[in-house]
Amino acid sequence: MKFVTLADMARTIRNNLYKIPHDVDFIIGIPRSGILAASIMAEFLNLPLIDLDSFIFGAKPTGGKRLRYRKESDREKKRALVVDDTLYGGTANREARKKLAPFKDKYEFIYLVVFHEGRCNDIDIALEDVRKYTNNFTQIVLYEWNILQHHADVMGRFLFDMDGVFCVDPPDERDAQVYHDYICNATPLFLPAAEIGEIVTFRLNSNRAITERWLSEHGIRYKTLTMFPAETWDERHNSGISPAKFKADIYSKRPMAKLFIESEDAQARAIYMMTGKPVYCVSTNKFYGGE
């Protein structure tokens, strides 16, 4: 399993500038994350930038005051670099080509992807080939900018902590009324759109109804909700089981689970040490057990 950060993407673009034509007139970003890659590229190359749909509807590429130092080309047919962050099956690439087809008489389009990770080869330039990580079902490349918004077949193989991931960490639950009021109205953080595999939370099972209601109200779909099997704080405390141990035990018993997403770094590290399986910490953006 390979984990790619935003810093990794910027580094890959910077280290591969020699692969990118420097005589293009502007850059088009394919929504959504392709715009992120295109923006970084436009900064490095000091080129005007526009997103795909704005270009289709007639808007002009822009780039701020720094572009006044850049000499524009006088060629009649402008060259545009069409950028996406990743290429796997090629759906977004094909849709972009279809949308841009009516403009081919006026523009020359060069298609570029930062990370080539799949079977589709219909691309002019790929900055980094990561297909060795995606050549079978057991391997995957995960990206910082969309790790919590994958499609269902990937998210279904993830286990999620709840507090600190889906919602802000609650106050000390020994103040029962304050804690109860908070988890009923917890402030949301990351809300996955696709159905996820399992939520593994150290919350007491006595709070199941409240937790299920909050998840439903915020559109979080899941296969399983696993909570600590105790009804009171004292009962859980007297068990001697730490949050990390509880989560690691569940993770170890799920052979199909490929990643645990945890909110707290010390717990993330402990879960990885106890299971030997990959763990991602959302608060520190650290990935344990990947490349």
Regions inferred by a protein language model and the residue ranges of each:
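Acidic, divalent-metal-coordinating active-site segment for phosphoryl/phosphodiester hydrolysis
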Residues: 87-94, 246, 251, 264-275
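Substrate-recognition element of Asp-dependent hydrolases with the DxDx(T/V) motif
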Residues: 190-212, 226
